[in-house]
């Protein structure tokens, strides 16, 4: 039981040392991540359409 208590005390100690982002930073980083995901989604969708069209053109 002492090991468990020691573990959770260590976890609490490390969590207090953590630098958490502000609401503004969190929002900013979330927008960046979502924008990047959408960009790559559109990019790879367009690439897939292009490769499919090229394949259909070559192998009619």
UniProtKB/Swiss-Prot annotation:
Topology in membrane: Single-pass membrane protein
Molecular-function annotations in GO: protein transmembrane transporter activity
UniProtKB keywords: Cell membrane, Membrane, Protein transport, Translocation, Transmembrane, Transmembrane helix, Transport
GO cellular component: plasma membrane
Keyword Methyltransferase carried by entry: no
Membrane-crossing residue ranges in chain numbering: 31-51
Primary site of residence: membrane
GO biological process terms held by the UniProt record: intracellular protein transmembrane transport; protein secretion; protein targeting; protein transport by the Sec complex
InterPro entries documented for this protein: SecE_bac (IPR005807), SecE_sf (IPR038379), Translocase_SecE/Sec61-g (IPR001901)
Subunit description: Component of the Sec protein translocase complex. Heterotrimer consisting of SecY, SecE and SecG subunits. The heterotrimers can form oligomers, although 1 heterotrimer is thought to be able to translocate proteins. Interacts with the ribosome. Interacts with SecDF, and other proteins may be involved. Interacts with SecA.
Function: Essential subunit of the Sec protein translocation channel SecYEG. Clamps together the 2 halves of SecY. May contact the channel plug during translocation.
NCBIfam families: secE_bact (TIGR00964)
Protein name, as recorded: Protein translocase subunit SecE
Gene (UniProt): secE
């Amino acid at each position: 039981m002492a090991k468990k208590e020691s573990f959770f005390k260590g976890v609490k100690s490390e969590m207090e040392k953590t630098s958490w982002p502000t609401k503004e930073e969190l929002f900013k980083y979330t927008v960046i991540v979502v924008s990047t995901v959408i960009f790559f989604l559109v990019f790879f969708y367009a690439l897939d359409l292009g490769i499919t069209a090229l394949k259909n053109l070559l192998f009619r």
